[in-house]
Amino acid sequence: MSNAIVRGSFRQRVEEKIVQIGNLLWLFFIVLMLQPVISRRMLEYARAQALRNLERSRGSRAIALVHRQETMNLLGFPILRYINVEDSEEILRAIKLTDPQTPIDLIVHSPGGLVLAAMQIAHALANRKAPVTVFVPHFAMSGGTLIALSASHIVMDENAVLGPVDPQIGEYPAASILRVLERKSHDEIDDRTLILADVAEKAIRQLALGVTALLSKRLPGEKAQRLAELLATGHFTHDYPLTVEELRRLDIPVSTEMPEEVTLFMRLFPQPKQLTPSVSYLPTLPGRRA
């Protein structure tokens, strides 16, 4: 009788342990599933705090347009991001909700994107009564440059770059498509290329006029037109980096007094995690000892 009781008690304890282990496994999987969400929320909170710090230090409305390749934590797939209509809608709403007399600080870190979206943002910024400052901590290419040109002030890191704003038709630069017409007779060119050339001609003309209008708000008309033709008509390759020194040679006023708050904000957009990091360093800030 006593042996049966002992065996029953032992079996009960084993079953309780199995249930406890099962509960722990379920808890582990729940935490594993929630971890990316919690990490994302904490990162978003830190970014919001960094923007508030910039607003307090400069008495402005801070907006960020950052397109960093990010990785989904759960599956590890890279997400490539560009300027799109969703970005323009959000920024237009932010501008609309900002008092007309309040300065706007826009942080731009982008490889470019849709001309429509970038031009909408640029026009909205150019029409502001209060000063607009665009901060470029690393690069603002193509559509990002278009947005930067609309600002009252451009502030760049000493090593940051802008880029040309010449339109792209599919996978080809519009200016390069037009040069085919100059080097071949129409009899040697297929219909598709002729159609692309027609679209390319219109795209270059439209973008050059748009850039001229933006630059005319801060530069003399003749100089604005000259710069627009240089940047929008294929004088450079589309990925050509325009450094601070070169922009100043082109008479585009650029400052390099980058606020520390912007640098700290960009640290909250780390590179996608890899098995072996491609860049390693000990983070230090100007004025602080390592």
Question: Residue spans of the language-model regions?
Answer:
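Glycine-rich, charge-decorated loop segments at or immediately adjacent to ligand/cofactor-binding or catalytic sites
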Residues: 140-151
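N-terminal organellar transit peptides
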Residues: 2-133, 139, 155-157, 167-290
